């Protein structure tokens, strides 16, 4: 991960990315590490240090390790309302529940939830649980860049 002042993106397989911002923040998108066949082994064994967790939807290959990463970092999770409430039941203390089109400032960054076309449910004891609409993220970084 890059030092302060630079933007760095590290792909950890499938849809899991670590983002290091110019201001020194560390974010993880759709943290699926342990069961992710494309995730490097060293990342499966350790929980990355992050300031913010962003989860796009409720499929296990996107939300799989979100609760563990958030709990171990005491990091807030940004996602749809239903998904955040479900993560609270998994022991996540800090959530930023949102709806599509909403914008918040969290960890010094502006986050906007945008529409995505996909399904969004997880299997909990083999019964599907709807976890809100799928979403994407628009981030405004500390230096004003938008990604």
Language model segments and positions:
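Active-site-proximal loop/helix segment associated with metal-binding centers of metalloenzymes
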Residues: 113-146
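Short solvent-exposed loop/turn micro-motifs enriched in small/polar/acidic residues
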Residues: 2, 10-12, 88, 95-97, ...
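Pre-active-site segment of Zn-dependent metallo-hydrolases
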Residues: 18-59, 64-71, 82, 120-129
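Short connector loops at helix/strand junctions that flank enzyme active sites
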Residues: 47-49, 106, 132-134
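Short hydrophobic/aromatic beta-strand or adjacent loop that forms the aromatic wall/cage
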Residues: 14-16, 101, 132-136
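Zn-dependent metallo-beta-lactamase
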Residues: 1-26, 33-38, 105-117, 125-126
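Portal/gating segments that form or line small-molecule/metal binding sites
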Residues: 68, 72-73, 77, 81-85, ...
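Conserved SAM-binding loop
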Residues: 11, 55, 76-79
């Amino acid at each position: 991960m890059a030092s302060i002042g630079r933007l760095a993106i590290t792909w950890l397989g499938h849809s899991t990315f670590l983002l290091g911002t110019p201001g020194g923040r560390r974010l993880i998108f759709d943290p699926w590490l342990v069961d992710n066949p494309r995730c490097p082994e060293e990342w499966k064994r350790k929980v990355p240090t992050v300031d913010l967790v962003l989860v796009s939807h409720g499929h296990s290959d996107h939300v799989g390790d979100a609760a563990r990463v958030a709990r171990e970092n005491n990091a807030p999770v940004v996602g749809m309302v239903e998904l955040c409430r479900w993560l609270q039941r998994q022991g996540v203390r800090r959530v930023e529940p949102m709806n599509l089109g909403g914008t918040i400032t969290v960890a010094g960054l502006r986050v906007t939830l945008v529409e995505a076309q996909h399904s969004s449910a997880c299997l909990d004891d083999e019964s599907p649980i709807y976890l809100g609409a799928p979403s994407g993220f628009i981030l405004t970084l500390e230096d004003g860049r938008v990604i």
